[in-house]
Amino acid sequence: MECIYCFETVSAVVPCAGKCDALICVDCFKGSMDALDTFPKCQCGLEYSPNELEPVLPAATLRGLDAKVKQVWDDNIHTVNAVNAQIDDCKKTYLDALPLAASIATQSFLRKALDDYAAKITKTAEEKPVDCPAEFCMGFRVGGKPCSVCGCTECAYCKALMNIDKPHTCKAEDLESIKAMDSNYVKCPECKKRVEKIDGCNDMTCAYCSTNFNYRTGLKQHGGSHNRIHLTHHQNLLSVKFQHSLSPSTLDALKRLETTMNVIESPKIYKRYNKKIAYEWISKRNMSTAIRREYGNISKEISALTVDDVELHLVSVLTKFNII
C-alpha cells in the first residue's frame, strides 16, 4: 500500500472513519496531527475514530492522540456545564418569582417540573438532525447549518430554498406568504411545525412529534385530538422508498444503518477524566457523522440506478461500515 503523502510503500495505514480510499502512513499522520490544533481529520474531511486509531499507532503517537481526545472531551464538558448553568439560572428565576409560602409548598414537585421546562427552553449542546429542504436530497441539517451533502438551507426570513454559495434575495410574495401563515397557523410548541385546525375543538396532537397542545393558547396539555394522524419521520428514508424492492436481509441491514445516524448526545459529567469513556464517545460521534454523510451521498447516486444496481450499491456500503 502506498501513502498518498510520502508515496512510500507501507504495511500499516491509518483507518478513516468514513472508510474512504485515502491511504496515510503512521508517520504522515503523526506529522499532520502535530501541526494542527484541532482533532485530526482524514483527507476526505472526516475526523478519525480514536478506537480505530489506537491499535495501529505507536506509543509516542498515541500520547499525542490522547491529548487531542482530552481536548475535545474538555471542550464538550465545558459546553455541558454552561448549559447546566443556564438551566439553573432559569429555575432560580421562576422560583424567586413565587411568594415564599407558595415556593415552600410546591418545591417537592415544582423543581422537577422546572428541570424539564428549563431544559427545553434553554439552548443545549445537542442539535436534532433536520431533513434537508431540497426535494431529492437525503442529507440532514444539524443546528441550522447547511446540508453537508448538497449545501442547501432555508432562508431564515422567507423560507425559500437557497445555496450558501449563491446570493439570495427574498421575494416580496414569499415574505407575504410567511406572514399570512404566521397569522393563520399555530406552531407546535415542541417541534415548531405549523398546524392548521380545520374544524372541531382546540385539543390538538401534532402529526410530526405527537405533542398534545391547545390550539387557542399554543401551550402543551395532557389531552390531544381524538383522531390522531402521525407522520413517519423522514418519509423518504431509503428503507421506506425501497421497502418492496430490496431483499429482506439488505432491507434489515439498511434499517440498522439508519438507526446509527442520530447525533450523539454530549457525554455525562464525571468527577475524574476517563480515557476509555472519552475514546468511546468521540468514536461514536465521528462514526455517526461519517455514516450520515455517506447516507446522503448514497441517496444522490442511486437516483438513476436500477433496483438491482441499488441493491449492489447498498450492500457495498453496508459492508464497508460492518453492518453486514
From Swiss-Prot:
SUPFAM superfamilies: RING/U-box. CDD domains: Rcat_RBR (cd20336). It comes from the Viruses. This is Uncharacterized protein 073L. It comes from Frog virus 3 (isolate Goorha). The lineage of its organism: Viruses, Varidnaviria, Bamfordvirae, Nucleocytoviricota, Megaviricetes.
